Amino acid sequence: MRLAGVNLPLNKHAVIALTHVYGIGRTSAENILRKAGIAYDKKISELSDEEAHAIREIIAEEYKVEGQARGEQQTAIKRLMDIGCYRGLRHRRSLPVRGQRTRTNARTRKGKRKTVAGKKKAVKK
């Protein structure tokens, strides 16, 4: 089944498969299935056309998913950078935003290590 431009795994339960869509987590997936009247443990391959249509409608009406959600997140980050607040500066410098230490660690955010040459040792005579 294809939903919001994503191929959902047919062999997984509906509540888990829906989380493959960007912008839908476990809680949102449960809420969607509750509104559609579908059991959480029903597999995607077992869904009828009416049930699939109900899921699509609920997501289209109430949720921002995939490109729309990503775009909104990028816009929020760009706004922080434009107004020059602390969080925006941290984003601009590719450093952790939420107060984590950076003397050691923070490798994911900072990227691969850039070696800096140390002091040259004086040659003894």
Swiss-Prot record:
Q: Which SUPFAM superfamilies match?
A: S13-like H2TH domain (SSF46946)
For this protein, the record's PROSITE patterns field holds: RIBOSOMAL_S13_1 (PS00646), RIBOSOMAL_S13_2 (PS50159)
Recorded GO molecular functions are: rRNA binding; structural constituent of ribosome; tRNA binding
Q: Does the keyword RNA-binding apply?
A: yes
Segments of this protein annotated with the region Disordered: 94-125
A single cellular component GO annotation = cytosol
Record keywords: Ribonucleoprotein, Ribosomal protein, RNA-binding, rRNA-binding, tRNA-binding
Can you list the disulfide-bonded cysteine pairs? none
The record ties this protein, via Pfam families, to: Ribosomal_S13
GO BP term, example? translation
Cite the record's note on assembly.
Part of the 30S ribosomal subunit. Forms a loose heterodimer with protein S19. Forms two bridges to the 50S subunit in the 70S ribosome.
Q: What does this protein do?
A: Located at the top of the head of the 30S subunit, it contacts several helices of the 16S rRNA. In the 70S ribosome it contacts the 23S rRNA (bridge B1a) and protein L5 of the 50S subunit (bridge B1b), connecting the 2 subunits; these bridges are implicated in subunit movement. Contacts the tRNAs in the A and P-sites.
Give the record's family classification. Belongs to the universal ribosomal protein uS13 family.
Name this polypeptide is given: Small ribosomal subunit protein uS13
Identify the coding gene: rpsM
